[in-house]
Amino acid sequence: MADGGSERADGRIVKMEVDYSATVDQRLPECEKLAKEGRLQEVIETLLSLEKQTRTASDMVSTSRILVAIVKMCYEAKEWDLLNENIMLLSKRRSQLKQAVAKMVQQCCTYVEEITDLPIKLRLIDTLRMVTEGKIYVEIERARLTKTLATIKEQNGDVKEAASILQELQVETYGSMEKKERVEFILEQMRLCLAVKDYIRTQIISKKINTKFFQEENTEKLKLKYYNLMIQLDQHEGSYLSICKHYRAIYDTPCIQAESEKWQQALKSVVLYVILAPFDNEQSDLVHRISGDKKLEEIPKYKDLLKLFTTMELMRWSTLVEDYGMELRKGSLESPATDVFGYTEEGEKRWKDLKNRVVEHNIRIMAKYYTRITMKRMAQLLDLSVDESEAFLSNLVVNKTIFAKVDRLAGIINFQRPKDPNNLLNDWSQKLNSLMSLVNKTTHLIAKEEMIHNLQ
């Protein structure tokens, strides 16, 4: 505290009135000796009496030493009931010094790590969490104790309870906690929420992390953990473009770039997920940026696959399966497959989505090169039935990816976008002016010819 003052539990800042350090130096060794002889209760009563004097005199250092000594003696004597009882008693004493309580709690936190008997450990954690509740000056210790408790609950199979306990912590508001530790806590909260399939809460918690933090040194492990959790979250949401961005962030991480196998797997996932993402301006821009990556040369099959989706030509699904199916789903010795199109329920769904992306690509190409086309011809080009083709076309029109009007009676699709009335009027006016100028010029030339003939 400023000017050597100590803060009491009620918030008052007080100065030390009497220095008891010499008395404490003398009494503590005597008490330790008596405690080892089994006279613990007598020692505690003596120390509590001394603690009252040091506390009243606002001697923070001496009070801290006494509080730490009491809990230490109880711990060494394995008097667990006495330990819990004294923690509660000492923290609630009238006008107790905050720094002294903080020192005692910090000492007890080391005992939590050392105790192996689970019921005793849980009781001590419970006592310490009760003592630290609502106290800002021991918020970090409370957070660490809560994390330990959540870990124990998870190990015992009660993941739901572990997630619930850890969610109590609003660590993003803990100014005294290091940024790195705060991020570790938030990532643990995300992991447990995903484990209990609480995706909405995971999404909310993920927003508490500013990704600029991962640009700092020694944050690569946390960065990879964060993006892997985000991939799991977006897999559930089916947001392929977001997954692609997460894999790009993983791919750009120096420790991934350092290992050929790892960056290749990450880049393969980037390519596959950007292809799986429905077409829009952002997806199109990302496809072209990924296409410019020189490292794609080292995974030629994936480079060629990406090129198919940037080339303004129709693709046949059967040809694509023949050329790339084995590589994408099973891989080869030189190029292992990713888990994107694995033989799982999710893998099969993504494989089906890839076929949908091929169909959508082909319809966009038709909209570019055709003004009108029959339904039968379009279905033939897409290798689909008429009904399936119409369903895909309708979906693209609804998403405003293309413009089309279907005459179902005639079986004709019109891709020509109707012109804006103002533009139409301007075009008509311009053409009319051009026509009148031509008529005027023609009339003038006829008159000129007549005059020449009359002179002759």
From Swiss-Prot:
Record's keyword terms, sorted: Acetylation, Isopeptide bond, Proteasome, Ubl conjugation
UniProt subunit comment: Component of the 19S proteasome regulatory particle complex. The 26S proteasome consists of a 20S core particle (CP) and two 19S regulatory subunits (RP). The regulatory particle is made of a lid composed of 9 subunits including PSMD12, a base containing 6 ATPases and few additional components. Interacts with ERCC6.
Organism classification: Eukaryota, Metazoa, Chordata, Craniata, Vertebrata
Biological role stated in the UniProt entry: Component of the 26S proteasome, a multiprotein complex involved in the ATP-dependent degradation of ubiquitinated proteins. This complex plays a key role in the maintenance of protein homeostasis by removing misfolded or damaged proteins, which could impair cellular functions, and by removing proteins whose functions are no longer required. Therefore, the proteasome participates in numerous cellular processes, including cell cycle progression, apoptosis, or DNA damage repair.
Residues modified as N-acetylalanine: 2
InterPro entries assigned: PCI_dom, PSMD12-CSN4-like_N, PSMD12/CSN4, RPN5_C, WH-like_DNA-bd_sf, WH_DNA-bd_sf
Placement of covalent cross-link Glycyl lysine isopeptide (Lys-Gly) (interchain with G-Cter in SUMO1): 92
The PCI domain, residue ranges: 242-420
One Pfam family cited in the UniProt record for this chain: RPN5_C
Cross-link entry Glycyl lysine isopeptide (Lys-Gly) (interchain with G-Cter in SUMO2), positions: 92
Protein name: 26S proteasome non-ATPase regulatory subunit 12
Gene name as annotated: PSMD12
